[in-house]
Amino acid sequence: MSIPLAERIRPKSLNDYLSQKHLVGENGAIKSQLDSQMLSSMIFWGPPGTGKTTLAMILAEESERPFYMLSAIDSGVAAIREVIEKAKKSDTLFSTKNPILFIDEIHRFSKSQQDSLLKAVEKGWITLFGATTENPSFEVIPALLSRCQVYVLESFSRTDLEALLKRAIDKDEYLSKKKVILKETEAILRLSGGDARKLLNILELVVLSENSDAVTITNKMVLQKVQKNTVLYDKTGEQHYDIISAFIKSIRGSDPNAAVYWLARMIEGGEDLKFIARRLVI
């Protein structure tokens, strides 16, 4: 099918939003803002596939605000200014329902691009939602960061992933027509790495590769179809230092299992072996 499974079953309301209960559950910080209809500018910080874009879309829908979306990968200052001008002409301007501008991968914006947002946020022409996989303290300019609340989105838990699998099989227009049985889930859950999008991509790949209306999913089947899990590891970002720190702490704490795990993460992610060796002798 042309539309990916993750898009077909994207949640449309907070009631259907499976994860991030610390933010959107009862007494959650974002849920409280939504209930009071006083949404502030926000930065959603978390790994891929944790629902950052979906959350932004749901908040716009449930607060009944105009919603504009830009990707920092292919948008420049001209695109930002165009959206701001549209927002300024909105009927909801200067109300509690001013337009929302969502910028995906906001960490990719240069300083000048981020600067172009400041006046619009300051004047209340827009409420800014930004999504990033990088630490906003390093990637978002201080003037913009001070005008936004930063919320950390966590990787999906095992329980959330299992619920997502069941929802996809039961609710998706295509999968629900097949008899999909989850006999074993360990492999598909492990390969997803807490990434909801990746989980759904694997599920769809496995089901579509079977030319049958009845599909029984096993660990062996998943591993045969996927073959290799690409480890999430950034050799130049904050994760680079977090993982080497965890590795060294595991050694100092005499925890061989943890030390081997962190070492394997670095090697699988393509870390420079000389870097690891240098840290070992410090």
Question: Which residues make up each language-model segment?
Answer:
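Conserved AAA+ ATPase "SRH/arginine-finger" region at the nucleotide-binding site
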Residues: 71-74, 149-162
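Pre-Walker A (pre-P-loop) alpha-helix and adjacent loop at the N terminus of AAA/AAA+ ATPase modules
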Residues: 2-47, 86-89, 259-263
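Short glycine-rich substrate-engagement loop in P-loop NTPases that contacts/grips substrate
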Residues: 23-28, 67-100, 111
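Walker A/P-loop
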Residues: 2-3, 32-71, 85-88, 118-123
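Conserved P-loop NTPase/AAA+ ATPase motor core
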Residues: 230-282
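Conserved catalytic/switch belt of AAA+ P-loop NTPases
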Residues: 31-34, 103, 107-146
